[in-house]
């Protein structure tokens, strides 16, 4: 994790080099480094509070010699009054194009930097800050004050993978225009403007509009922003004058609608374009059928994957959270790997989870920031993801690398005394999250524990660890027996809570079949059909 090391990125700049003298210029912004994390408002500067640069250019000549030009305080210059007035990865960007001239040619060798300052050396020491999540008894981890190591980035960079122009335009109020992309996207706009110098353009984003309901009287058809929470998702552009293009560089938004205000000349539809960012550069898997609704569902899944795989697997692309919740990550892993080639992407996530594992063996519920309050349904993600990666790519090295951490986690779970008990260990509230009907947490936790033990036996077998394979097989059998004796009513075959009261939820039957913990699969399957038919063949679970 960033607590222990910082990723360095390599670029091949051969194609940018020209004969003779060359120059290099770099613009710094917050990014993940000093942005707010964990949706707790005060958690800005999460990893560090100073944007800084450590770089070198390695030149290899035809005669085999090489020369290195590195950052230093003598040859490099710094300027802090450029056109970027404000930049936040989640909140947006403010850009004054009138000030752009002072640095437009800053990467050319003939640029005059005589008025610029000499930079100073900044130690790469992490700040120490943490916040407690009220009501859950868990805190986001302190960021240790230490000097991290530098390691090479081994995941593919985020790219622009799709483009889409606005489909409709509507004037909401004088000078306020709403553009509809007719598709949820995650990225930035590219807008062509024709305004006078000094004109201040405000650009906002939304996923949905207020519906025509009494409680929203006067707001219907305008942008609903409540689901963005503290993410203001607003860009500001101050025009230089004439035709100019604004494309934010140091932020990203999740949106379908773009609101542009402050303009005298509303951009045409073809002048409002959205650029989709993603770590998913191409899809190898697809689903096509004769059913239009099913096809659209499959398309939505692909778009959701593109929008939520930006450096890390996030829970949402728009609000102030955008965190790598492990439960979301491992549940979707099988689908993601069938859709796209993401071996390095997921191995990076596994690495972050292992790095954040506690000395006792507990995995984090969130990576790479750590912390959370999910419990077993989230902490087990490493086991699920490692097995999915092995099944997809057959690379035994993935299992070898992460197996010791998984063993440590299983020992931690054994010490917690979770399986085989009706005592609520209060290890986290996240089960079938936000479901219309509640499923007993112990039913879910023990189903997950069975699946963990089952997968660990398979992993140990793949690694040739026969003794450990048998140990995990025995544990899985024990938990499975306990689950069926505790959470299934013998007469009706319906699921029940740990106290013997009726559970009978769609989730309880689905998890029993999916994870293989049910002994009487036929009866459990019949109850799942009954529950699904009763709600019109819809999904009645949470996530």
Positions of predicted regions on the chain:
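Extracellular/oxidizing-compartment recognition motifs
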Residues: 1-318, 327-328, 344-347, 363-368, ...
């Amino acid at each position: 994790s960033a607590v222990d090391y910082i990723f360095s990125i390599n670029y091949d700049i051969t194609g940018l080099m020209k004969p003779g003298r060359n120059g290099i210029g770099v613009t710094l912004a917050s990014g993940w480094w000093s942005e707010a994390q964990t949706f707790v408002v005060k958690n800005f500067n999460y990893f560090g509070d100073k944007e800084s640069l450590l770089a070198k250019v390695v030149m290899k000549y035809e005669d085999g010699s090489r020369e290195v030009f590195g950052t230093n305080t003598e040859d490099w210059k710094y300027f802090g009054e450029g056109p970027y007035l404000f930049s936040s990865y989640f909140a947006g960007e403010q850009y004054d194009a009138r000030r752009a001239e002072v640095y437009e040619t800053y990467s050319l060798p003939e640029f005059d930097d005589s008025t610029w300052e000499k930079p100073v050396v900044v130690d790469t020491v992490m700040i120490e800050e943490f916040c407690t999540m009220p009501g859950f008894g868990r805190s986001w981890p302190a960021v240790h004050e230490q000097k991290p190591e530098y390691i090479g980035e081994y995941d593919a960079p985020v790219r622009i993978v799709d483009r889409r122009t606005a489909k409709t335009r509507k004037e909401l109020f004088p000078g306020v225009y709403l553009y509809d992309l007719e598709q949820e996207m995650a990225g930035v706009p590219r807008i062509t403007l024709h305004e006078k110098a000094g004109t201040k353009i405000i650009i906002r984003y939304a996923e949905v509009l207020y519906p025509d309901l009494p409680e929203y009287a006067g707001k219907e058809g305008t942008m609903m922003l409540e689901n963005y929470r503290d993410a203001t998702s607003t860009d500001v552009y101050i025009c230089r004058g004439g035709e100019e293009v604004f494309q934010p560089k140091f932020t990203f938004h999740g949106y379908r609608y773009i609101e542009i205000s402050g303009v005298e000349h509303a951009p045409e539809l073809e002048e409002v374009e959205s650029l989709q960012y993603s770590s998913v550069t191409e899809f190898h898997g697809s689903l096509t059928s004769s059913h239009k609704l099913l096809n659209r569902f499959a398309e939505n899944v692909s778009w959701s994957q593109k929008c939520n795989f930006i450096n890390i697997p996030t829970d949402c692309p728009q609000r102030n959270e955008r965190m790598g919740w492990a439960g979301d990550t491992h549940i979707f892993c099988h689908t993601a790997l069938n859709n796209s080639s993401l071996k390095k992407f997921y191995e990076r996530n596994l690495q972050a989870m292992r790095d954040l594992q506690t000395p006792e063996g507990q995995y984090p519920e969130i990576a790479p920031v750590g912390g959370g309050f999910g419990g077993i349904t989230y902490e087990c993600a490493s086991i699920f993801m490692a097995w999915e990666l092995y099944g997809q790519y057959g690379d035994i090295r993935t299992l070898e690398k992460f197996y010791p951490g998984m063993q440590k986690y299983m020992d931690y779970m054994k010490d917690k005394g979770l399986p085989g008990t009706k005592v609520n260990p209060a290890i986290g509230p996240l089960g079938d999250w936000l479901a219309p009907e509640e499923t007993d947490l112990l039913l879910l936790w023990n189903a997950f524990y069975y699946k963990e033990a089952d997968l660990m036996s398979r992993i140990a077998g793949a690694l040739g660890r026969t003794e450990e394979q048998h140990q995990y097989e025995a544990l899985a059998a024990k938990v499975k027996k306990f689950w069926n004796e505790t959470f299934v009513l013998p007469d009706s075959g319906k699921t029940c809570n740990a106290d013997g009261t009726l559970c009978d939820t769609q989730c309880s039957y689905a998890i029993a079949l999916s994870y293989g913990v049910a002994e009487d699969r036929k009866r459990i399957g019949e109850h799942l059909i009954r529950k699904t038919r009763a709600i019109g063949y819809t999904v009645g679970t949470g996530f």
